[in-house]
Structures are given as structure tokens and as C-alpha cells.
Amino acid sequence: MAKASTKKRKVIVESIGEAHISATFNNIIISLTNKKGEVVSWSSAGKMGFRGSKKNTPYAAQMAAEDCSKVAMEAGMKKVKVYVKGPGNGRESAIRSLHNAGIEVTEIIDVTPLPHNGCRPPKRRRV
């Protein structure tokens, strides 16, 4: 059977971009995009090999942010505007490790969605 020839699309990378950090209760997903919103590099705690309850730890977020920023810096990204979404543990450590990796953080914006009393939340856990 012939292999389908798919051409990998090339994303135009500028020196200024955006970092979208989604920190849920179960996982942390970090996407570095250009100004248009096209993804330059992405990483998550699950992609880094963490499983189960270890995925939502500050250390897992740090490892994911370092992996993501390494690829973006090779592509030529230098400054990012950070958008943080969700209530997860690794929010601050992901931002800190982006900065320590050599990418300058210009501003941090919290875009966590807040309901105007929409859906009923899940019932309380009884352990």
C-alpha cells in the first residue's frame, strides 16, 4: 500500500508570540503560537511522560514548559504574552520556567472562563 505523501506545513515564526497555558485539574497543556494564533510548538504533562495524578503537579508543568520553549526558541521566538486558563496547580511554575528558559514574558493575562451561574457543578467527592 502506497504511503500518503503529506507535506508538513511551515509556520511563520516572529520574535513576539503568545503562550497559552491551560491548567486543568487533570493536565497542563502549553501552546506557543505566533500573533495569528498558528501553533509553533506545544507540550503537555502527559506528553512528557507523566501519568495519573502526577500530571497536575508544578514539576510536570515546568518540564512541559521547558520542552515547549526549547522548540520555539530554535524557531526564533524571543518574547511572549502569556494567557493562563484554568484552576490547575502548575500555572505559576509554567510561567516561571518559560522565563528561565530564555523567553521574555511581557505580560500575563488570566482568561479563565467564569460562568454567570450556568451549569450545575459535579457533586462533592466523599472519600
UniProtKB/Swiss-Prot annotation:
- What role does this protein play? Located on the platform of the 30S subunit, it bridges several disparate RNA helices of the 16S rRNA. Forms part of the Shine-Dalgarno cleft in the 70S ribosome.
Q: Which InterPro entries match?
A: Ribosomal_uS11, Ribosomal_uS11_bac-type, Ribosomal_uS11_CS, Ribosomal_uS11_sf
Annotated gene: rpsK
**Record-linked NCBIfam families:** PRK05309.1 (NF003698), uS11_bact (TIGR03632)
Report the protein name in the record: Small ribosomal subunit protein uS11
Determine if tRNA-binding is one of this entry's keywords.
no
Organism equals Flavobacterium psychrophilum (strain ATCC 49511 / DSM 21280 / CIP 103535 / JIP02/86)
Oligomeric and partner information: Part of the 30S ribosomal subunit. Interacts with proteins S7 and S18. Binds to IF-3.
Might you name a Gene Ontology BP term for this protein? translation
Question: Might you report a single GO cellular component term?
Answer: ribosome
Q: Which Pfam families match?
A: Ribosomal_S11
Alphabetically ordered keywords of this record? Ribonucleoprotein, Ribosomal protein, RNA-binding, rRNA-binding
Q: Which Gene3D superfamilies match?
A: Ribosomal protein S11
Record's family? Answer: Belongs to the universal ribosomal protein uS11 family.
Q: Which GO terms describe its molecular function?
A: rRNA binding; structural constituent of ribosome
